[in-house]
C-alpha cells in the first residue's frame, strides 16, 4: 500500500473525474463538487485511521464477544475495473480517489472462529446524490465450514453482484438488481454518517431505499436487494460527549449509530435490534501497511 503521493498532488487527479462515465453509481456529468482542502489536510497525510471496538454479536441465536477494527484510508483506483492503482500508472482521466473502509469483524463460535471483512470504496468527490456513495463493496466471510465472497458494483439505477459460495444452494451466482434513484447502501453508512466533508442528507433526516449490508444478508441467507428505509437524526450524548444519533430503520431492523460531533467525527458505537452492540475502544493513525516486522504487534495496543 502506498499513499505518500496523496496531498497537494491529489487535486490534480480530481481533474480526471470530469471524464467519468455513468458506471459504478457515478454521474456522467462529473463531480458536482470536489473534496475540500480541509478534507485532504486530514486524509492526505499518508496514514490510515484505525479504530478498535469491542462488540457483542449474535450468531446461531447466541451472543458472542468479538472485536471490530474499522480502517479508513484514501487511495487511488482505476475506474475501469475498480481496482487499486498500485503502480501509479493509471491514466489520470481513469483515476478516482476513494476513501476506503475495511470493516474487520472477528468472533468465536464454540470451537471455530469467524472472520468477516467488508470493504467499501467511496469516491471522495461528489459523484452521486449523496456524498461518499460507494463505487464498490466487497465482503469475504471465513469459518471452518468454508468461505464466501460477494462483490457489489452500484450503478445509478441498479447494481451488479457476484457471489461465490461454498453452499451448494448458492454456488456461483451473478445478478443485476434494479434500484430506485438515490438508493443508499448500508455498508457505506459508516463512512457517510461521519459527515467528513459536509452533512449527510443536507443535515436532515432521510427516507428512501437502502441495500442492507452484505454480512446481514449473508447471515440470513436472503437475496440482496433494496428495501424502503428511513434514517432519523437527532442530537444526543454518549458517555458525556455530544453526538449525532442516526437511527436506521427498515422492516423489523433498527440500528442506531452515535457519531461524535467534534472532529474527527468518529463512530463511537452502534447497536442493532438483532442484538449487536459495538463500543469504541481507541483510535490511532498509522501507516499500518509498513508495520509488518516482528515486534510491530505492539501497535495493536493502540486499538485496545
Predicted segment positions?
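Positively charged n-region of N-terminal signal peptides that target proteins for export
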Residues: 1-4
